[in-house]
Structures are given as structure tokens and as C-alpha cells.
Amino acid sequence: MDKPPPVCGNIEVEPCGQRIVVAGDPAGLRSLAELLTWLADLDQESMAHLPEGERAHVHLYPGSQISGNSTELELCRLDAKGTGAFPRGFESAGDQARGTGYPEWFMDDPDNL
């Protein structure tokens, strides 16, 4: 698929201190997951309009794909077309990058959201 899938449901993106909170209803979270999967599976090498060394990305705009009071969201591939290089200054998440780090999970305490 050349075009990204549509964003459905409700998604909100907002800064909260040193964090970015991404919240959504079930449909919104599922469509965001589909968009991330699309971006991950995208064959950057076959994108003639994407220059070598650049990275595929999509923008989600407040009042359009995400809630009107959201902060604009840009979702990007880290690996550059042609080189696979990550951006200068990138720092790995350590164990999480190898699939062994689990996110903290807060189900019942709204103060942890």
C-alpha cells in the first residue's frame, strides 16, 4: 500500500511535563497501531520521491487526524533510505531495543496516566 491507512476513532496527543501522552478510544488506538505497522512495513527503497538518506514519515494534525486540542504528531522511521543509518545523536533504549524491556503498566491508578 502506497498511501497510509486513514486514522479513525479519537486520538489525543498532548505534552504532560516531561512526557508526551497519546490517548485514544479503542478505534483510535487500533488505527494508530495500523498506521505504525504501515510505516514499519513500508518499503522506503521503492519510494522514488524519497531521497536517499531521508526517512519516511507521516504527520497527524490537530483537528484533522487527531483531536483539535492535540499537539501535532510526526511519526518517523529511524532508518534512512539507502543507508539504514539512524539520525545522528540517536541513543538506543538498551534492553528495550532488543525486545526484552517491558513498559510500565498502570491499570487502576489514574495518577499514573
Which residues does each PLM region occupy?
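Positively charged, low-complexity terminal tracts
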Residues: 1-113
